[in-house]
Structures are given as structure tokens and as C-alpha cells.
Amino acid sequence: MKLARVLLDGRAYEARVEGEELVTTWGQRIPMEAAVLLPPTEPSKVICVGFNYRDHAQELQVEIPQEPLFFLKPPSALVAHGQPVVYPPHTRQLDYEGELAVVIGRRCRDVRPEEAREVILGYSIFNDVTARDVQKVEKQWVRAKAFDGSAPYGPWVETELDPSDVRITTRVNGEVRQDSRTRFMIFDVFTLVAEASRYMTLEPGDVIATGTPPGVGPVRPGDVVEITVEGIGTLSNPVTGEQPADTRRGR
């Protein structure tokens, strides 16, 4: 089942996807092309994982991690399917990173990998938008990865998916930039859920973005980024705003 959130008359409502329609909990049917989708859950936190594909770590010339490298994005970074990613003024290289997202279904702490499936609601799609030039010079990734608009998430949550070997494809203006499968992850989905739950309580709706495969690269205003995950669908976001000719550093 695909679970979504939709904006109707200025309010958010839950819905399920049936073919090319959204069906609300009271039975109203909304054509997909007319729907205004919201991020499919309201996470208390977004947990991201760095360098979880060996060949991605190699393309960025970093060491292969021996344990998951976690970092956080705030809920204010979220962007819904179809909504714009506004080019931030503090970077000159804004990169896409297509990822599979795990969505937590119930409150949990200290989950074992073999129990992780029981606390997962389902899976979605995530774009870990990154100010790459900032990331390269700063040890903390707040300005590089936690700014407003850095977390496109959606379009819905698929509750019936085997995440062990699904295809992830990222296109920019229709051109394939990333094409890989989740079987190439260093740490699988259930290990990531278990490890994250060792350090923080996971709440319903929380998101764990599981890392990006190789092929990351920059986007410019006017580009459209489409990330497709087999069995889920496609997350699409245009890039708007202006790419700065200069940035101020040292603040």
C-alpha cells in the first residue's frame, strides 16, 4: 500500500494511492495530477547516512566507514514531491544525492537488526541535497546539508517493499546520473535502523535516508531532478532561484 499526505483547503490529510488517484480516509478521490502532495510523514528528525555505498565513498576519495556515519537534518529542511529546491546563497555547487528512505512506524529504542522490520512503516525516496563546496572545507555538515530545502522526501510511503535489492535511478533533465541497487550498500536497512536506535529514540514518521550510490553531481537553477526507486515511484523536484557568482565564507 502507498500512503500519502495531501493538502486540501489549506489542511493536511492522509490518503492512499489507488492507480492515478489519491483516496482520503473518508473516500474522496483526487486525481493525481490535481493533488498537492506533502512530505508523506512529519518526522521529528531525519537521520542520514554518509558513504554507505563503497563506490560512492571511492568517488569522493574518503575512507570506507567501519560503522554507519550518521548525521541529522531538521524537519525544516523537508521539501515535498513537486515543490522547488531553492538554490541557497551560501554555495556555488549544489549536488543531488538520490537515496532510499526508511520510514519508522512505531516508537522504539535499542532495536536488534532482526527486529527492525517490525518497527518500519515502509519506504520512500529521499534527495540528500548537499552544498558540496561547503562540505569539502567544513568538518561539521550543518551548513552543507541541513539548510532549508535540503531534504526532498516523497512522494509517498510504500508499505510493501523488500528493500534488499531495489534499483535506484537519478535523472537530471531526463539524463541518467545515478543507477545502482540497494544490494551494494555497506550497511543494510535493518542494520541502519538498529544502529540508529542505539543512540536515539526513533519516533513514528522519522526518516532514515540510507545513503547514496555513485554518480552524484551538481545541479543549476532550471534543472529538474527525478529520483526513481523500484517498487515505490519517482520523486521529482525543480531547482529554482539563482546560482551565486560568489559566496561569503568564515561566518
Map each language-model feature to its residues.
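Residue-level recognition of short, solvent-exposed, well-ordered loop/turn junctions
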Residues: C48, A80, D95-E97, E203, ...
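N-terminal accessory regions of nucleic-acid-interacting proteins
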Residues: R109-Y123
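Structural signature of FAD isoalloxazine-binding scaffolds in flavoprotein oxidoreductases
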Residues: I64-H81, Y96, E226-E230
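N-terminal non-catalytic cap/leader segment that marks the start of a structured domain
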Residues: M1-P68, L161-P163, T169-R171, E175, ...
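Short acidic (Asp/Glu) patches
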Residues: I30-A35, I64-P65, V79-T91
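Short, structured patches in soluble enzyme cores that scaffold and shape functional sites
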Residues: K73, G98-L100, I104-R106, S124-V129, ...
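Catalytic-pocket segment enriched in acidic/His residues
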Residues: P39, H56, I64, Y87, ...
